[in-house]
Amino acid sequence: EDVSDDEMRTKKQKRNLPRVFFDIRIGNADRGRIVMELRSDIVPRTAENFRALCTGDRGFGYHNCCFHRVIPQFMCQGGDFVKGDGTGGKSIYGRKFDDENFQLRHEGFGVLSMANSGPNTNGSQFFICTTKCDWLDGKHVVFGRVVDGQNVVKKMESVGSKSGKVKEPVTISRCGELI
């Protein structure tokens, strides 16, 4: 089968995409690792913000941060390491940064997207979709996807509620970049 130069380049670029991880604790029990691939080829600023918040190499980030809002059959939202309740957070670029583009879609389980409070208000809050959420396309910047640990996301989802309040704390006990 012939593969064009463009297709080869695309495959090579995708192999070089950064991968980051969260080790998840629910209540007092370690529940496993989520591995996420970041689309630095399409949304480099958004992907770099998330990567740097996973590594903590700017002196702040997701370590010990909670998922403050979990709605089954919708999403798990976290990333407010400032206030922990969904009202705070900051990016590596300062407080907020602009929507980079909306090329990637909320096409199903495991999609990683930026939470915001309107256009161009990205900080550190993000969510992991647990279903297709196409009504969010064009409003929230998708920047990656879960590539391993889907079962851990399902465990997180199971302690959520319709209101988003979690039955037990869901915490990122460790995080970083896989190299």
Swiss-Prot record:
Residues spanning the membrane: none
GO biological processes: protein folding
EC number(s) per entry: 5.2.1.8
Q: What is its main location?
A: cytoplasm
* GO MF entry, a single one: peptidyl-prolyl cis-trans isomerase activity
Catalytic activity, as annotated: [protein]-peptidylproline (omega=180) = [protein]-peptidylproline (omega=0)
Supply the Gene3D superfamilies for this chain: Cyclophilin-like
What keywords are annotated for this sequence in UniProt? Cytoplasm, Isomerase, Rotamase
What does the entry list under GO cellular component?
mitochondrion
Q: List the PROSITE patterns.
A: CSA_PPIASE_1 (PS00170), CSA_PPIASE_2 (PS50072)
Q: Per the entry, what modulates this protein's activity?
A: Binds cyclosporin A (CsA). CsA mediates some of its effects via an inhibitory action on PPIase.
Q: Please, which domain of life does this record's source organism belong to?
A: Eukaryota
> Where in or outside the cell is it found?
Cytoplasm
Question: What residue stretches are annotated with the PPIase cyclophilin-type domain?
Answer: 21-177
**Which PANTHER family does this UniProt record tie to the protein?**
PEPTIDYL-PROLYL CIS-TRANS ISOMERASE, PEPTIDYL-PROLYL CIS-TRANS ISOMERASE D-RELATED
Family of this protein: Belongs to the cyclophilin-type PPIase family. PPIase E subfamily.
Q: What does this protein do?
A: PPIases accelerate the folding of proteins. It catalyzes the cis-trans isomerization of proline imidic peptide bonds in oligopeptides.
Q: What is this protein called?
A: Peptidyl-prolyl cis-trans isomerase E
The species this protein belongs to is Schistosoma japonicum (Blood fluke)
